[in-house]
From Swiss-Prot:
Full protein name: Protease HtpX
GO BP terms: proteolysis
Organism: Vibrio vulnificus (strain YJ016)
GO cellular component: plasma membrane
Molecular function GO terms recorded: metalloendopeptidase activity; zinc ion binding
């Protein structure tokens, strides 16, 4: 959850900043949005640009956001085991050794991020290391390594780029129509202000609606990461890890969405979750 939400929030922020900059350029220079084809090209440049900038920033931002400490030289047996386990799994999965970090949190959390399969990050919480058995923790690590091996951050970026493109295109197309109707009654300055306000408002609204698509895709990829972990360490270890997370959720019924997809609510809430419900993931693994 942490990996996906950080990417989506950063992506939205970058796209909005780029959008504001473009609107200021329009206002200062008097340029108009132009033809539909020109608008689509601009939307694609900004949409994919925002997504890929977010991806390139993801590793450093993720570390800073949790106050993670990179393990360069293991200081104890736990850190030694952690590095050794990730190294072994990375070799099995055919990827470069990820940067490994630990961050202080009582929650059972872990995430992976990074722009490249050979330049990635795997971070685990102290809560995970303290509350899981070695077999369970090994399965969680295998799940994160599988995300990297599957190239999930890159495919999510491409998906987000497409979504961004349509969000920007539709927002500005509608804003242009509204501003054009307004220009018959008001001055040019008012026309640009209307265009600016409507385009930003619609980007926020359409961006929220588009998150249903990106969250669906994220849930889809979680099943693949679970299957990848099952291939690396065996499905029983992966099931045990999910069962442990389920027990943790049941002991803390506060509705918190953890990094491994724990949430007590279903229905509409599930559509906005980056991870499928644990019961569905466990059932899928039992049939694997």
């Amino acid at each position: 959850m942490k990996r996906v939400m950080l990417f989506l929030i950063t992506n939205l922020a970058v796209v909005l900043v780029l959008s504001v900059v473009l609107n200021i350029v329009y206002a200062v220079t008097g340029m108009q949005p132009g033809s539909l084809s020109g608008l689509l090209v601009m939307a694609a440049v900004f949409g994919f640009g925002g997504a890929f900038i977010s991806l390139m920033m993801s590793k450093g931002m993720a570390l800073r956001s949790v106050g993670g400490m990179v393990i360069e030289s293991p200081r104890n047996e736990t850190e030694h085991w952690l590095l050794e386990t990730v190294s072994r799994q990375a070799q099995q999965a055919g990827i470069g050794m990820p940067t490994v970090a630990i961050y202080d949190s009582p929650d059972i959390n872990a995430f992976a991020t990074g722009a490249k399969r050979d330049d990635s990050l795997v971070a685990v919480s102290t809560g995970l290391l303290h509350n899981m058995t070695r077999d369970e923790a090994e399965a969680v690590l295998a799940h994160e390594v599988s995300h990297i091996a599957n190239g999930d951050m890159v495919t999510m970026t491409l998906m987000q780029g497409v979504v961004n493109t349509f969000v920007i295109f539709l927002s500005r197309f509608i804003a242009n129509m509204v501003a054009s109707n307004n220009s018959d009654e008001e001055g040019e300055g008012s026309n640009m202000m209307v265009y600016f306000a409507v385009s930003i408002a619609l980007e926020l609204v359409f961006g929220f609606l588009a998150s249903f698509i990106t969250m669906w895709y994220s849930r889809h990829r979680e099943f693949h990461a679970d299957a990848g972990a099952a291939r690396l360490v065996g499905k029983e270890k992966m099931i045990a890890a999910l069962e442990r997370l389920k027990m943790s959720q049941e002991s803390k019924l506060d509705g918190t969405m953890m990094a491994f997809g724990i949430n007590g609510k279903q229905s509409l809430t599930e559509l906005l979750m980056s991870h499928p419900p644990l019961d569905k993931r466990i059932a899928a693994l039992r049939n694997f």
